[in-house]
């Protein structure tokens, strides 16, 4: 008798995705982040669901309802901090996952890569709207500043911003719609992630060497299921440490002050995972130019496949490109630091130089390095 997991219509899908999936035998720990992102997403949906049961999306009670969750709901503080810090862990995994894709040439699977970029934008939008919900000072002013950027769009900008706000400022209507979107988007992300996997399984996984691995495939289970479980346990340990020892480490103290439209915080800044993009935005004195640079800083990922000049797929055997890649990582860390600093000398010029370097590495230096490496190998 044939095994039910290979014949049942539903079980067959699961079997072909997580059990009998032929997987390259040499994929490293950098390939763990895909499954970790799945774990993070499920965790965020579950904790978010329980938070939504006690949260009220109203300007007068939102801040109090979050306080109520932390003080009065059984283990409410755990749920709240797992959700808040879970977002940070989510973004760490995201950056690692995208970095892996850049390093090993995974962007040469165009459908998977493009769905990934859409996922990245959707997750960033979801995280931004989630940050507004506690209705603290940084929630309110962050929402005001970031939504206001849309007013830089010629002709329709102002109308567009007021349409998004649902009034003439960030107010009750804005909070209500942000809650609605923040609730629905994770389920859209879940569907997109399924499509992302669907396209990945059309081609099979890439591997560190960048050469076809059809001759050496192993079943996903038990080899990679156990590896993914280990990754998930390490993720859980990291998150638990963060939640139980320093839950506010990555947050902003200003968000413990209820939102006040009459008092602007001294330094308005988003969550740490947006600081690199915020630094790029601030490094351009012109409003529209800054907004375009901000969007392009992420959208640039979409043209990476077109800029691939090397005859090798990954960077495993390309020392020049490796140096540029790690320079890019250092540059992004610098931008993250600058994004959290006030707009004054010397931070302005450092931010501008780091922004120029970011685009130069991706658009100019990496393609040139690929050509040089081809010539060095006489290819």
UniProtKB/Swiss-Prot annotation:
CDD domains the record matches: cytochrome_b_C, Cytochrome_b_N
Primary location class: mitochondrion
A GO term, aspect molecular function: metal ion binding
Positions annotated to bind a ubiquinone: 201
A GO term from the CC aspect: respiratory chain complex III
Keyword Transmembrane helix: yes
UniProt: heme b b562 binding residues: 83, 182
Effect caused by changing residue 57 to S: In lineages GB01, GB02, GB03, GB04 and GB05
Pfam families attached to this UniProt entry: Cytochrom_B_C, Cytochrome_B
Signal peptide: none
Gene3D superfamilies documented for this protein: Cytochrome Bc1 Complex, Chain C
Name listed for the protein in its UniProt record: Cytochrome b
Organism taxonomic ancestry: Eukaryota, Metazoa, Chordata, Craniata, Vertebrata
